Amino acid sequence: MAPCRTMMVLLCFVLFLAASSSCVAAARIGATMEMKKNIKRLTFKNSHIFGYLPKGVPIPPSAPSKRHNSFVNSLPH
């Protein structure tokens, strides 16, 4: 029973070393990766939030429209 347990522990240790060494090698920065030296600051020009808005078109006001929201005698007297 003891030799079988020793072989299982040794096999698990070898598998652990193989798995951890492959993960470390993948995370290491090599010559194939390009590092950016100039990091842009988050401003209004290059912000992702303002990139979704249309360019050159004014944003309509958020007030209710007087054309389709006006009912005659809608106020209680």
From Swiss-Prot:
It comes from Arabidopsis thaliana. One of its GO terms (biological process) is regulation of cell diameter. IDL1 is capable of replacing the activity of IDA while IDL2, IDL3, IDL4 and IDL5 are only partially redundant. IDA is processed in vitro by the same proteolytic activity releasing the CLE peptide from CLV3. GO terms for molecular function: signaling receptor binding. Induction: By wounding. Residues 1-26 form the signal peptide. Keywords: Secreted, Signal. This is Protein IDA. Interaction with RLK5. InterPro entries: IDA-like. Expressed specifically in the floral abscission zone. Involved in an ethylene-independent separation step of floral abscission. Promotes abscission zone (AZ) cells rounding. May act with RLK5 and HSL2 as ligand-receptor pairs. It is found in: Secreted, Extracellular space. GO terms for cellular component: apoplast; extracellular region.
